[in-house]
Amino acid sequence: MEVKDVSFSYDKDSPIVFENINFSIEKGDVLCILGPNGTGKTTLIKTINGFHDVNSGTVLLNGTNIKEMSYNDIAKLVGYIPQGHVPSFPFKVFDVVLMGRSPYINLSASPKEEDKEIALNALRTLGIEDLKEKSYTNLSGGERQLVFLARVLAQEPDLLILDEPTNHLDFGNQIKLLEMIEQLSNLGLAAIMSSHYPDHAFLAASKVAIMKDKTFIDFGTPEEVLTEENLHKAYGIDVKLVELEDNRKICVPLKTNLELVMSNYSKKFKLNDK
């Protein structure tokens, strides 16, 4: 995917949501888009996936302008996992994953044996074949997210786009999902994911973009982009980058001025109480 000078607003009278967005990713890349709440990450994810028309600029998939592609053609190249998917019907897990074959099946046709085998292989790839007969609605949040990822893999896309994929997952399931994204990239899939957590980029990403003030304030490798200065610009707090024994870094937030504010409030409360 290549994104060139992309800007977007919901209509001509609405303020710009983001502007001058530029990046490209290749086979095996994982791009993590970081930024505070309300900065436009989800809108950007939907725009590059073809759900919104850009005001200006172009989004290219394998060299083709996404505006010139049908949703079916996009679905054959891009697998999309939205934020906080809530199941509506108690489908079996296997049937949910089999739905990923929809771009390849005519509306009047039924899935072929080849489609079923591809769906089964997607479950095997993620190590969740044992869930195939279970009801999707009865799964835990972490299991549902893995099943949805299997459904996307059944599409056989070149690119995964994930909007805050670890949202509502406990710590263990967050790590498992990020490790799975990294493993899939090692198999040649490209991925774009949004997150609130810089540590997610250190764990799984080869490229990072920080989104703030309607655009990317930096783009590059995690080592280049995730500096203490950039993280302060993005989130308004001081952090310390700590290097672990395996040369991996983590972000440790330092104390904010909240402690001072609460201390002053407490003193004022005690004075008023007298």
Where are these regions (language model features)?
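The feature captures the beta-strand-to-loop junction immediately N-terminal to the Walker
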Residues: 34-36
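Helix-to-loop junction immediately C-terminal to a conserved catalytic motif
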Residues: 49
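Conserved ABC transporter NBD signature motif
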Residues: 57-65, 74
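Conserved ABC ATPase "signature" region
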Residues: 98, 113-131, 156
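Conserved ABC ATPase signature
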Residues: 135-139, 143
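Catalytic Walker B motif of ABC-type/P-loop ATPase nucleotide-binding domains
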Residues: 160-164
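ABC ATPase nucleotide-binding domains
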Residues: 234-274
